C-alpha cells in the first residue's frame, strides 16, 4: 500500500518582486526574453528549462521538460526526437502549452499556441553545433520506446561512436527542431498573501496583443 503524504503545512510567502501594468511591453515575447535573460544572469538552476504539454487527439495530456534553445521571430524553439511520445502527439495535435518556472525569482510564464517543425536546414545548423556525444546519442536512441537494459543503449552508443570517429555525425531525419507560435502568454509574479501579479496577453486577429490583469 502506498504511503500517504500530508503537505498542508508546507508553504512560504513570495515577496521579492512585483509586476505592474507599466512594466509590460506591447509584445509579450520581449518580456519573455527579458525574464529568461534575468534567470540566466541570476544563475538559477536550468534557466532555459521549459515544461512542454501535449495531448492526444482525444484529449489525453502528457508533459515533460526540455531545454529552450531560441526565442526567434516570435517563436519559442526547442529540439527533440520526432518519433518520441511528444513528437507523435504533436504530429496528431498541433496545440501545445509551455510553462517556465523559476523558483528563485518567484516567476512563471505560461504559453499556449501551435507548433510545427523547423526546416531541415535549420535543424541541421543546430545539430552541427551540438557536442559530439550528444549527436551520437540522438542517432541511437529510440526515444520513448521500451529497451531491454541500460547495457543495450550503451552498446549502441559505443558502436555508433566508433563508426563516426574522425567523421561528421549527420543529423537523423527523425530528430530536429520544433517552433511554438504563441497565441496566449501569461506572466505570473509571486506576491505576499497569495495576491500574486498575473497578466495575460492574447493575440488578436490584427496581430496585436491585448493585455489583461487576472485575479490571483
PLM features per residue range, with description:
Residues 1-216:
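Binding-site signature for planar aromatic cofactors or substrates
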